[in-house]
A protein has these predicted regions:
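Short, surface-exposed acidic-centric catalytic microdomains
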Residues: 21-70
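Hydrophobic alpha-helical segments, chiefly the membrane-spanning helices
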Residues: 149-154
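Short N-terminal binding/cap micro-motifs at the start of the first secondary-structure element
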Residues: 11-18
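Short, well-ordered beta-to-alpha junction loops that form the rim of enzyme active sites
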Residues: 8, 104-108
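Short Gly/Thr/Asp-enriched flexible loops that form oxyanion-binding sites at enzyme active sites
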Residues: 110-129
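Glycine-rich anion/phosphate-binding loops
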Residues: 77-91
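Conserved small/polar residues in nucleotide/adenosyl-binding loops
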Residues: 137-144
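Extreme N-terminal starter segment of soluble prokaryotic enzymes
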Residues: 1-3
Length: 154
């Protein structure tokens, strides 16, 4: 089985703060799957480290619809970079033949179900990140849109 996975979950130091989000449960998937790492934010041209960013005015679906933006904490609009990264992740997923995707929780790119609310206050709201929304939007059928949660590593 081929699985596209957020690179930070594999220990790649590509988080906004220059760190990683290494997750042993995700890493163990390599025993039964071919893991294909991707960092949509770096693929979109953003540096590491970079200022924190959140979706302002909605969620990933709203960004795809042009109704919300991804902004950094210092007020820079990075929406285009997030869109570019999402489309890159989609291309990697499709061209690799991946059947599953494991993405970083709460990220403005990869969040699934919960993202930060755009106020930079640490408050969560329901919604998906831009990459997650892009992948779900292009999913061939509703049965493929199953969400599962993996325990987060601290």
């Amino acid at each position: 089985m081929k699985v596209v996975i957020s690179a930070c979950l594999l220990g790649v130091r590509c988080r906004y703060d220059g760190g990683d989000s290494r997750n042993e449960i995700a890493i163990e998937q390599k025993e039964t799957s071919e893991l294909i790492p991707v960092c949509p934010e770096e693929a979109g041209g953003l540096p590491t480290p970079r200022p924190p960013a959140e979706i302002v005015g909605g969620d990933g679906d709203a960004v795809l619809d042009g109704k919300a933006k991804v902004m950094t904490a210092d007020g820079v609009d990075v929406t285009e970079a997030y869109l570019k990264g999402a489309y890159h992740a989609l291309q990697v997923t499709q061209s690799s033949g991946a059947t599953h995707v494991i993405l970083k929780a709460r990220s403005p790119s990869c969040g699934c179900g919960d993202i930060y609310d755009g106020t930079f206050s640490g408050t969560l709201t329901s919604g998906d990140g831009v990459t997650t929304a892009c992948l779900l939007y292009t999913s061939p059928s509703p049965r493929d849109r199953t969400r599962s949660r993996m325990p987060s590593s601290a």
